[in-house]
Amino acid sequence: MKTLYSLRRFYHVETLFNGTLALTGRDQETTGFAWWAGNARLINLSGKLLGAHVAHAGLIVFWAGAMNLFEVAHFVPEKPMYEQGLILLPHLATLGWGVGPGGEVIDTFPYFVSGVLHLISSAVLGFGGIYHALLGPETLEESFPFFGYVWKDRNKMTTILGIHLILLGIGAFLLVFKALYFGGIYDTWAPGGGDVRKITNLTLSPSIIFGYLLKSPFGGEGWIVSVDDLEDIIGGHVWLGSICILGGIWHILTKPFAWARRALVWSGEAYLSYSLGALSVFGFIACCFVWFNNTAYPSEFYGPTGPEASQAQAFTFLVRDQRLGANVGSAQGPTGLGKYLMRSPTGEVIFGGETMRFWDLRAPWLEPLRGPNGLDLSRLKKDIQPWQERRSAEYMTHAPLGSLNSVGGVATEINAVNYVSPRSWLATSHFVLGFFLFVGHLWHAGRARAAAAGFEKGIDRDFEPVLSMTPLN
């Protein structure tokens, strides 16, 4: 085993001074951490830490499988997914499994298979986690040097980073292959109201793909969240997968440059803080994606977005009053602006009333009625199809505005359905988790930097309350 320095030197955070750093146990005497400090006891025990990570993966996959089967068991095909509190089946449906035209579920068997596969996988991971936590070697460096590591070994750390990047790249390409070769994925923009299709004409132009990154994050622009066709999404995954795999190979083959060795803190806690920071960013981006994007998260499965429900309400009443004889092109509303239609700041014809603020919504049921200058008056008079009316009435009554006690829908909409949209659940949970991960990032980054600077003492364990309490046994 390569020991680059004394272990005492390597672990700067000073905890209990018991004179030994024997890498045995699970107790406070040998590790300096009490049982409730969790994986801190395993900082120098690579074998045990492997067990903790594999067991954690097993718990995650077990939840996925069990929750998947729970949703299948409770699923009612006659109701939309978003009315049933489902968050996993919409993801499977978006990948094209079990659904047909219009997002109608025609076969639940693929969902059952997915749940069972995850349960079986979780059993394998659970066994591996228990094995490595209880029976396997405490450290991997001696017996399996390829899997062993020392936190300070910069070259080994970037090799591990490279392996992770390659795995992420393979994950991105799995979606690409599903969309191109294995049955396709669900396209909410398919003519007539959405269908499963294979993606044939990928967007690989770097100016388009990386153009998303250069967009403003604000309304009408919307950064990467504004993507609204599957060719761009799958093309983006080709780019991302390629970059991850090439970057992974690069990190495996190279050693960190001098500037990187100087700029970064190279300790286990520092790597933890970097990972938490990255996950926090992912959480915030996912929050915005599921809240605003109805292409990657089709409204047929997740329910309408907030702007979509609002625009659908305006559209529904335009249809109703036009049938009753209103001239929707010129009718004046209570504020003197157009009651049904008005102009946006840049001159497009948009829906009037309170929904004017959502004028940059794009949705598959609405786009056929647009012309070169926004909503086309002649199309609104002649071309509205029954499926567009049905869908907008459905979305109008299912705004993603439910609270925890489920007083759902727009307050002024008497037909609103009492439910909490999966968009609300997923956006809120990812925002909250993203925030907590960010706090964890700051906490561990601060500790890691202080330890590297040599002045982190940790909690003074002489006066720690738990030490003066009666032992549990």
Swiss-Prot record:
Residues 1-14 form a propeptide. Gene3D superfamilies: photosystem ii from thermosynechococcus elongatus. [CaMn4O5] cluster binds at E367. The modification Phosphothreonine is found at T15. InterPro entries: PS_antenna-like, PS_II_antenna-like_sf, PSII_PsbC, PSII_PsbC_sf. Binds multiple chlorophylls and provides some of the ligands for the Ca-4Mn-5O cluster of the oxygen-evolving complex. It may also provide a ligand for a Cl- that is required for oxygen evolution. PSII binds additional chlorophylls, carotenoids and specific lipids. GO terms for biological process: photosynthetic electron transport in photosystem II. Keywords: Acetylation, Chlorophyll, Chloroplast, Chromophore, Manganese, Membrane, Metal-binding, Phosphoprotein, Photosynthesis, Photosystem II, Plastid, Thylakoid, Transmembrane, Transmembrane helix. The keyword Repeat does not apply. GO terms for cellular component: chloroplast thylakoid membrane; photosystem II. It is found in: Plastid, Chloroplast thylakoid membrane. Belongs to the PsbB/PsbC family. PsbC subfamily. PSII is composed of 1 copy each of membrane proteins PsbA, PsbB, PsbC, PsbD, PsbE, PsbF, PsbH, PsbI, PsbJ, PsbK, PsbL, PsbM, PsbT, PsbX, PsbY, PsbZ, Psb30/Ycf12, at least 3 peripheral proteins of the oxygen-evolving complex and a large number of cofactors. It forms dimeric complexes. This is Photosystem II CP43 reaction center protein. It comes from Glycine max. The gene is psbC.
